[in-house]
Every structure is written in structure tokens, then in C-alpha cells.
Amino acid sequence: MSTKLILSFSLCLMVLSCSAQAAQLWPWRKGQDSRPHHGHQQFQQQCDIQRLTASEPSRRVRSEAGVTEIWDHNTPEFRCTGFVAVRYVIQPGGLLLPSYSNAPYITFVEQGRGVQGVVIPGCPETFQSDSEYPQSQRGQHSRESESQESSRGDQHQKIFRVREGDVIPSPAGVVQWTHNDGDQDLISVTLLDANSFHNQLDENVRSFFLAGQSQQGREERRSQQQTREEGGDRQSRESDDVEALIGANILSGFQDEILHELFRDVDRETISKLRGENDQRGFIVQAQDLKLRVPEDSEEGYERQRGDRKRDERGSGRSNGLEQAFCNLKFRQNVNRPSHADVFNPRAGRINTVNSNNLPILEFLQLSAQHVVLYKNAIIGPRWNLNAHSALYVTRGEGRVQVVGDEGKSVFDDNVQRGQILVVPQGFAVVVKAGRQGLEWVELKNNDNAITSPIAGRTSVLRAIPVEVLANSYDISTEEAYKLKNGRQEVEVFRPFQSRYEKEEEKERERFSIV
């Protein structure tokens, strides 16, 4: 009897141990956190939104090889949704230094191409380069370790190619860096979710850099202190937020002796540079001789499979599968490919969606994105988000947007253009009409499977309601209710209304094009 009890107790301990390892290796898991969602508690009184604004960045922080642009997230819509928006402009050859945040985020590449690195705690270094270093740069290693190092080359975690139209997610606390190896500026916009349950701090988003230093950041801190002394509450709060987003080199706070003891093979000068002393380059620096071997799309799957086989050959059969599940996650999905459109109307435009179905990591981050392309004068909506807030970032063209809130009043009715962000809270109905040059935008949302409900069209809510119910709801005849219900046969994206003259003109053009 005692033997059975001991065996049962041992099995329970083993299960608990494996569960703890899984939780430790995968801290971004989707879960219903037991603690109250601090964002909803603190911001619910700030969601009484009477007016929305389409805004551009309010702060610019210059670095040696680029600019960091920050939106004012103290406006009612930003505070309500918990969104924080940042745009990075990296010049050719520029390197956005390694950093992490206390909140998950999703990035959209608006322009250019580059290389992205992701560092996941506990995952192996499955990538290697052909770089060779002289012995003096390797430190005092044994001959055996030197021979192993020279045979392997430089090893590191995964890197991948990024280009225009890519959506790149990042969990809280995971280090990422970006290098522009193209011939034009690499521009990306990032949306951080301060209300995420992954953020264990307050409603502020913080950036933590592993290198560099920002002279402008020091100036912001001095300006912040002066603002506090002058009693400017809003300006002081905005300065606090900007300082947190600009971040600082976390190594600069450690003493030289501690760092020298940790990194024993480096000299005092290197320790000083680790701490960013006298470094005025900012957090986007000009990289020197940065040659990275990046697998192209067709190679990435092969490299991943080869890495799995190598680990199996080294005896990784003892693995419980956690490494394969977590370390091989995909961190990129392109939403700018017409052939992958989820909704397409040849006369109106298209919608591409990236969510947890085609990018599984988004399930754990509770984020997703849509890329919408509208042709000349085309219309989308009215529609609303059932389970998410959204931030619309305009990438091309111009158009008119109308948003209606819960009081049945318009909270936004204006034109939008490239570079602007419009935050739309959950449930607010939106209609967008493109201008003469068309309109393109990306919608970043705080749900991994955000659902929209259109009011018009073949998949609309009105289409799903019986004609008699519509007739009584709007006090109209059943004939008019039928027309209302079935007037549009398109799905979500609608071609513009055409007069009889315009229709005849279009038919004439089609006839000549066929001839």
C-alpha cells in the first residue's frame, strides 16, 4: 500500500514539474488571468468619447541613423483603448538596437526591407554565419573550445528577412532588433497594447534597451523635471510617457565591477561601452561591416527542419517537445499579397487578414491585423468590431472616414491621409470612402481573432434579419425592406455608386478594350 502511495506521489510531482517547465518556457500563453484587468478598471471612466481625431506623431527623437516618432497617447481614445503607437524610420545601414518592452506589440512594415532578429529565452542558437574572428577577439579559451568555435562560426538565434507589408508580432520581454540592409529608409509602425494581461506594471509602456544611450532622452528627463516644478500636469505626464518609450540602456545602471566580473574576457573600455558612457548615437545607430546571412523564404523552412534533425542527432530525443513547439514559431506574415486576399472585389478592393489562424503566436499575444486596399471612390462599411479596439494607420492615398459612437452621434467625420492614425473603440461603427487616388491602410487590433460585423452587403447583419422584422423596425413597407436587405450583393468592399452616364461610359470602355 505504501509503495503505491509513494509511486502516485512521485507521478504527481513529475506532472507538476513538467507543467512548471512549460509555463516557464512559454510565459506568453493565452490564459484567463485571475487578476482583474487593470486597464478596464482604470480606463473605464475615460471611455466616454465624444470626439475622435486622426493624428500624426507628436514627438520625434533623432538618432545617428534614424528617427523614432511617438504619438500622443494621452488623448481620450488612446487612453481608453490602451494603445501606444510608435513609428521607426531607419536609414540605409541603420541598426535599431536590441530592446524589449513590458507589453506585447505588433509591427507593420510600411516601406523598405531589412533583417529582423528575435531572441527567445531558453531557445537554442540554430543559426550560424560564416564569420571568422582572430584569436585575440575570442578571449582566453581552451584549445578545444577554440577549435569547436572555429568549426561552428558565429552562432545565434533566428533572424529573418522583413519587407514591405510584413506584420511582425513580439511578446512582452522578448528582445528584437532590426537592421536596414536595403537602399531606402525602412519605415515601420508599431502598436503596443498597454492593457494586455502580459503587462504586469501600470498603464504605461516601457522600453528597455540592451545597448546605446540617448542624449535626447537625458534632455527629456531634465525637461520633465523642469515641467514638474512648473506644475504642468498634462505636459509632465506626456514627458513621463515619452521618457518610458525612449527607454534607456539597462546596463548603464550596473556598476563597472559587477559587469567586469560577469564578462571576464573583456577589458575596461568595453565595459564602459556596454554601459553606453559617452555614447551620443541614440538607439538607431549606423552599423559598420554588418554582414548577415539571412535565409530567404524558401530556405527558412529547410533551415528549421535541418535544425530539428541536428538536435535529434545530438540526442534530443529526450526532449518533451516544448522546444519544437515554442522555438520554431513563425514571427512574420505578409498582408500585402493580392493572391492571399480574404475578401476581393475586382471593382472595389481587397482585405488581407493576419490572425492566430495563419500566425499562431498571435493567439498568445491577443493581437491581429488587417490590410485594406480600396480603389478609386470605393467604400467599406459601415461595420464594427465585435471583440476588439482597432487603430487605422493610413499607408497610401486619402479618403473620408465617418465613425458613429454609442449615442448615435458622429464622433469623427473627416478626411484621412498617409501617416495618420485613427483609433476606433470597440463597437463604434465605421464607414470609409476612398478618394480619387484610392486609399490603403492597416488596422491593428487587440484580439487575435478580431471579428467585424458589416451592416450592408451579402454577409451583413441586415441580410440575416427577416424582412418583416426590418419592415417593423424601420416602419417601412416589406418591399422597401426587401430592397434594403438585398440591395448589395457584394461582401464588405463595395464599388462606388455609378450614374447611368457613368455606367454607359464604362460599358463603352470595356467594349473597346475587348476589341
Swiss-Prot record:
Query: Which effect does the record note for changing residue 362 to R?
Result: Significantly decreased IgE-binding to the wild-type epitope 347-R--N-387
Q: What happens to this protein after translation, modification-wise?
A: Proteolytically processed from a single precursor to produce an acidic and a basic chain that are linked by a disulfide bond.
> What is the top-level taxon of the source organism?
Eukaryota
For this protein, the record's SUPFAM superfamilies field holds: RmlC-like cupins
- Biotech exploitation of the protein: This protein, when mutated, can potentially be applicable to the development of transgenic hypoallergenic crops of tartarian buckwheat and specific immunotherapy to treat tartarian buckwheat allergy. Destructing the native conformation of this protein significantly reduces its allergenicity and it may be a candidate for the development of vaccine that builds immunotolerance in individuals with buckwheat allergy. Production of mosaic molecules which are reassembled derivatives of the protein may have advantages compared to production of modified fragments.
Provide any one GO MF term from the record. Answer: nutrient reservoir activity
| Annotated positions for site Critical for IgE-binding | 163
Signal peptide, first to last residue:
1-22
Quaternary structure and partners:
Homohexamer.
> Which protein, by its recorded name, is this?
13S globulin seed storage protein
Lineage, uppermost ranks: Eukaryota, Viridiplantae, Streptophyta, Embryophyta, Tracheophyta
